[in-house]
């Protein structure tokens, strides 16, 4: 996976709601490590599924981003969660 590309995709498509690993719509559903684990989202496959298909207030990006871009952004999110989004 290309983490640098994932960061670019995140900044362009995700940061409006998820800057710094937060969640402006549902504050308890952050991209922080503990929240990802608690919600069963601490795997690339789980994140790629949700980014592709959307859920609740989160739109589906499957029609807007390529599979490889979605995989890159999922790897970026997991990488950042391991580093505490610092």
UniProtKB/Swiss-Prot annotation:
<keyword id="KW-0408">Iron</keyword>
<keyword id="KW-0479">Metal-binding</keyword>
<dbReference type="GO" id="GO:0015979">
    <property type="term" value="P:photosynthesis"/>
</dbReference>
<dbReference type="InterPro" id="IPR008168">
    <property type="entry name" value="Cyt_C_IC"/>
</dbReference>
<dbReference type="GO" id="GO:0009055">
    <property type="term" value="F:electron transfer activity"/>
</dbReference>
<keyword id="KW-0349">Heme</keyword>
<keyword id="KW-0150">Chloroplast</keyword>
<feature type="binding site" description="covalent">
    <location>
        <position position="14"/>
    </location>
    <ligand>
        <name>heme c</name>
    </ligand>
</feature>
<keyword id="KW-0249">Electron transport</keyword>
<dbReference type="GO" id="GO:0020037">
    <property type="term" value="F:heme binding"/>
</dbReference>
<protein>
    <recommendedName>
        <fullName>Cytochrome c6</fullName>
    </recommendedName>
</protein>
<feature type="binding site" description="axial binding residue">
    <location>
        <position position="18"/>
    </location>
    <ligand>
        <name>heme c</name>
    </ligand>
</feature>
<dbReference type="InterPro" id="IPR009056">
    <property type="entry name" value="Cyt_c-like_dom"/>
</dbReference>
<dbReference type="InterPro" id="IPR036909">
    <property type="entry name" value="Cyt_c-like_dom_sf"/>
</dbReference>
<dbReference type="GO" id="GO:0005506">
    <property type="term" value="F:iron ion binding"/>
</dbReference>
<feature type="binding site" description="covalent">
    <location>
        <position position="17"/>
    </location>
    <ligand>
        <name>heme c</name>
    </ligand>
</feature>
<dbReference type="Pfam" id="PF13442">
    <property type="entry name" value="Cytochrome_CBB3"/>
</dbReference>
<dbReference type="GO" id="GO:0009543">
    <property type="term" value="C:chloroplast thylakoid lumen"/>
</dbReference>
<keyword id="KW-0793">Thylakoid</keyword>
<comment type="similarity">
    <text>Belongs to the cytochrome c family. PetJ subfamily.</text>
</comment>
<keyword id="KW-0813">Transport</keyword>
<keyword id="KW-0602">Photosynthesis</keyword>
<dbReference type="InterPro" id="IPR023655">
    <property type="entry name" value="Cyt_C6"/>
</dbReference>
<keyword id="KW-0934">Plastid</keyword>
<comment type="subunit">
    <text>Monomer.</text>
</comment>
<comment type="function">
    <text>Functions as an electron carrier between membrane-bound cytochrome b6-f and photosystem I in oxygenic photosynthesis.</text>
</comment>
<feature type="binding site" description="axial binding residue">
    <location>
        <position position="58"/>
    </location>
    <ligand>
        <name>heme c</name>
    </ligand>
</feature>
